[in-house]
């Protein structure tokens, strides 16, 4: 179960990182 949670957490982080990069680029 822990592995599944880690995978989900990693996916969420990956989705969040690109979103932040896009927002930062848009602001710049």
UniProtKB/Swiss-Prot annotation:
Its EC number is 4.1.1.63. Optimum pH is 7.0. Stable between pH 6.5 and 9.5. It catalyses: 3,4-dihydroxybenzoate + H(+) = catechol + CO2. The keyword Lyase applies. Inhibited by oxygen. Completely inhibited by HgCl(2). Partially inhibited by ZnSO(4), 2,3,4-trihydroxybeonzoate and 3,4,5-trihydroxybeonzoate. Unaffected by KCl, MnCl(2) or EDTA. Not stimulated by thiamine phosphate, pyridoxal 5'-phosphate or biotin. Not inhibited by hydroxylamine, NaBH(4) or avidin. One of its GO terms (molecular function) is protocatechuate decarboxylase activity. Homopentamer. This is 3,4-dihydroxybenzoate decarboxylase. It comes from Sedimentibacter hydroxybenzoicus.
